[in-house]
């Protein structure tokens, strides 16, 4: 029975107070909504769930485990712990961990969940803001953190979305000197950012003489879920920011590069076969990371247009990190009318819905009609997925 169906059965649960009933529905809905997202928690019978928004905003188990694979040490703190998904999996890599959260209800839920399930018996719950927690640290203890993790809230006081790091809460740009002062010599800062934030601008805002940043653009099944910044201490100001674009559905195809490599990359010139050749679209992580030219160079592809992030080759490139089609033909509006096909538009004058309507296309099948610009000219391809 779904939570919506259950909500209509209030009369059968008269023994529950209104508060108990709301809590009961919250638990049913939380388990229902996160069963696939958080399978480890779903398998624990007495696991508690927070309100819907917290369940929606929390990391998935897959992305949380990936973050945990990047770090290890003696002690860590999660300054914006929320539901505690990242805290749970990150803490497995450390001997001691602090959970910091300003929402009292989330702290209550975390205390219950971590009390009997966490692998780390040294995890402590702190009901506090990030700023107050940091202010409470002092002496050698205050300089003993091997990891400071934060996922700054990306909404203002009125609930509106913000897109600059300095407008998020806590303001990690302002807090950066304080964060650095609490790290061990090999300690690191990890920030989880929105996919909507400008990566280059975020790194620039967090620039400091003593540290460099590694960037991780993390996608799952071609949807970017989060952008991670992980600090590394360095006095070499010439050291470049490395960027890893990874889709956790195909982690072996991770694409690692620097902005300088992309900037200095020259595109391949030539005349690839557009009929019978192969068409490529990099995965969402690579596109978000901005490796538009470098992906062409590394895989020996030709880019269709400076502003069209589609690529072609005469022969099939194996293990390409993204989608691949075989081009059956270029086609005109008249050629494509009335058939059944999936529609994709990239740098094309019409949206997929507009093109579909114009062509009188029915959804489905294995064929694709792909609209894009080739050397500035709107072009249609009729293709099949490889």
Put a short name on every predicted segment.
Residues 1-386:
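SAM-dependent transferase fold signal centered on methyltransferase-like domains
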């Amino acid at each position: 029975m779904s939570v919506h169906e259950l909500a209509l059965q209030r009369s059968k649960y008269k023994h529950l107070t209104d508060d108990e009933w709301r809590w009961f529905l919250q638990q049913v809905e939380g388990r229902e909504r996160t069963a696939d997202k958080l399978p480890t928690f779903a398998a624990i019978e007495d696991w508690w769930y927070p309100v819907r928004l917290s369940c929606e905003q929390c990391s998935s188990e897959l992305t949380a485990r990936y973050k945990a694979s990047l770090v290890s040490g003696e002690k860590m703190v999660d300054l914006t712990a929320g539901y505690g998904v990242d805290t749970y999996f990150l803490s497995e890599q450390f001997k001691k961990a602090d959970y910091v959260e300003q929402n009292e209800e989330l702290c209550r839920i975390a205390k219950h969940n971590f009390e009997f399930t966490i692998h780390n018996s040294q995890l402590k719950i702190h009901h506090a803001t990030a700023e107050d927690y940091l202010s409470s640290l002092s002496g050698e203890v205050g300089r003993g953190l091997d990891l400071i993790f934060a996922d700054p809230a990306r909404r203002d006081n009125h609930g509106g979305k913000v897109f600059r790091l300095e407008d998020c809460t806590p303001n990690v740009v302002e807090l950066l000197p304080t964060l650095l002062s609490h790290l061990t010599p090999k300690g690191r800062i990890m920030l989880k950012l929105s996919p909507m934030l400008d990566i280059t601008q975020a790194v620039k805002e967090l620039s400091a003489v003593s540290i460099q940043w590694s960037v991780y653009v993390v996608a799952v099944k071609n949807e970017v879920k989060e952008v991670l910044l992980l600090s590394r201490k360095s006095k070499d100001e010439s050291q470049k920011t490395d960027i890893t674009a990874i889709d956790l559905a195909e982690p072996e195809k991770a694409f690692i590069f620097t902005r300088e490599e992309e900037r200095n990359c020259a595109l391949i010139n030539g005349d690839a076969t557009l009929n019978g050749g192969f068409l490529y679209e990099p995965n969402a992580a690579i596109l978000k990371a901005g490796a538009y030219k470098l992906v062409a160079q590394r895989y020996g592809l030709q880019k269709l247009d400076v502003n069209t992030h589609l690529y072609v080759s005469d022969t099939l490139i194996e293990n390409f990190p993204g989608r691949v089609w075989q081009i059956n033909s270029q086609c005109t509006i008249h050629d494509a009318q009335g058939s059944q096909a999936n529609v994709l538009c990239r740098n094309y004058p019409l949206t997929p819905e507009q093109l579909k309507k114009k062509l009188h296309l029915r959804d489905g099948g294995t064929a694709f009609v792909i609209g894009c610009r080739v050397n500035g000219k709107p072009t249609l391809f009729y293709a099949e997925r490889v």
